[in-house]
Amino acid sequence: MHFEIVTPIIEIETIASGSTIRILALLRKQYGGGHWRKLKGAATVRLDDGTIRLAELHWFEAHGIGKRKMRIKRFLD
């Protein structure tokens, strides 16, 4: 599902970091080494069909690499 983030991400929490990330080997292979963390937060998103919803987002992030593999986990509204 493609989406666009409309508002800044709020309530950001770290879910996992380092070796506790299940796909750590894949992240390092695709994007390079770094201190990878899995994070979650909430933001208003615009979906492909134009609807705007509040969603919980999950993504991976490493210093110097940025946010990768962002996805909608669930809708909060």
Regions found by a protein language model. Give the residues of each.
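Cysteine-centric segments in proteins
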Residues: 1-77
